[in-house]
């Protein structure tokens, strides 16, 4: 067996893990980001050592990237222990900040909370959405290289037919995150005719076409290992993004934007009916001749082409979520309601997932069936609600510390009925320049470039190193170095105020 065949076999025929285990791992970054914000606030009270570019990068890397690497590798069986450490650290930092509060020092906790609920937020940008997209990007970047090493648990790898693996979440999470900030949600193409809107949508696809074709040519030219049942012979992630964007652009021309959830449910349900009552499922699994043929364009790429329908449903659900979250709100209490509503919706979807998996069909990444779509949306909503709740706690910490500033977090604007002296301090915080020393902002700014860098460096590592026989310490060092390099490049570009766009 050749090295290529060994690597392909190493990532194939996996059955995944439980939905609960994946959900546990997904919510941990929200806690880590909260701890990072609390540490920055406390450091502003104690010293200024965290306010230079090098130190801030290391802090962000330690709180955002390192926990992801360890959760997907050596601490995969100790996620609850990581939660315990993060909760203790976060609670300790919050308690210390509260004890050192410079505002409302003599006021009881209940009164402080009452005043906090009256605070307004400068909500032009929602930090939780930026963090959501960055967490998904970082998770994907770690996983695509880690999966080739023995220290990566096989249960986290992409499943072969049925089941839920941590890596199965990646594409769906990316599509959902992109949908939340799509031009339609941001009303970017509101001016002009429908034809103008469609033209702009099509024009925005050419970088993805370039990347998709480029990846296909590169993979075939170097004879790189491939997981055939993931997308097919020629298809890849970029082609899925193109197809989803094309279909959803047409759908949003026909259907009202605020009824995207109806479209999402309809597509997912009809697609599942087609899988159950037509030869569509047999076509995906066994090809047109029933023997797994890869002859012809459809047979060669049947998984990638047909699963697009499921991802379209996920995208439409993301559009509806984006419309809800990006709706203008002024008070912190409104955002508490939003976070709770999203959390309850996620719980409802997880209950629906259980019912569907028991009575209809188990989740399948390969087909992107109804259960898979529900799982992706529920997982995205649980992560988003965790990040929103973390932002609210961080806002409380900023509320009690005069002139506290944390990059990629809400700016506070006090309500007119509040204490005048504290009003001045919070308005100053709202008007001061946002610190640029932030890895999260940097990754969100050049997300596509970060993903491209991760793919290229993953290929270089695989071509130059025998990943299958790498020891755990060596693999862990390589993974952290790989992520450190990619993050540093993106961070330096951000410090130089450069956004790399191909369109």
Swiss-Prot record:
Top-level taxon in the UniProt lineage: Eukaryota
Family listed: Belongs to the PIGW family.
Chief location bin: endoplasmic reticulum
UniProt KW keywords: Acyltransferase, Endoplasmic reticulum, Glycoprotein, GPI-anchor biosynthesis, Membrane, Phosphoprotein, Transferase, Transmembrane, Transmembrane helix
Membrane topology: Multi-pass membrane protein
Name of this protein: Glucosaminyl-phosphatidylinositol-acyltransferase PIGW
Cytoplasmic topological intervals: 43-56, 99-131, 182-201, 258-259, 326-337, 391-447, 494-503
Lumenal side: 1-21, 76-78, 153-160, 223-236, 281-304, 359-369, 469-472
Function: Acyltransferase that catalyzes the acyl transfer from an acyl-CoA at the 2-OH position of the inositol ring of glucosaminyl phosphatidylinositol (GlcN-PI) to generate glucosaminyl acyl phosphatidylinositol (GlcN-(acyl)PI) and participates in the fourth step of GPI-anchor biosynthesis. Required for the transport of GPI-anchored proteins to the plasma membrane. Acetylation during GPI-anchor biosynthesis is not essential for the subsequent mannosylation and is usually removed soon after the attachment of GPIs to proteins.
Gene Ontology MF annotations: glucosaminyl-phosphatidylinositol O-acyltransferase activity
Cellular localisation: Endoplasmic reticulum membrane
EC code(s) of this entry: 2.3.-.-
InterPro entries for the chain: PIGW/GWT1 (IPR009447)
Gene Ontology CC: one annotated term: endoplasmic reticulum membrane
Glycosylation sites: 15
Modified residues (Phosphoserine): 415
Pathway: Glycolipid biosynthesis; glycosylphosphatidylinositol-anchor biosynthesis
Residue ranges of the TM segments: 22-42, 57-75, 79-98, 132-152, 161-181, 202-222, 237-257, 260-280, 305-325, 338-358, 370-390, 448-468, 473-493
Record flagged with keyword Isomerase: no
A GO BP entry: GPI anchor biosynthetic process
Enzyme class name: transferase
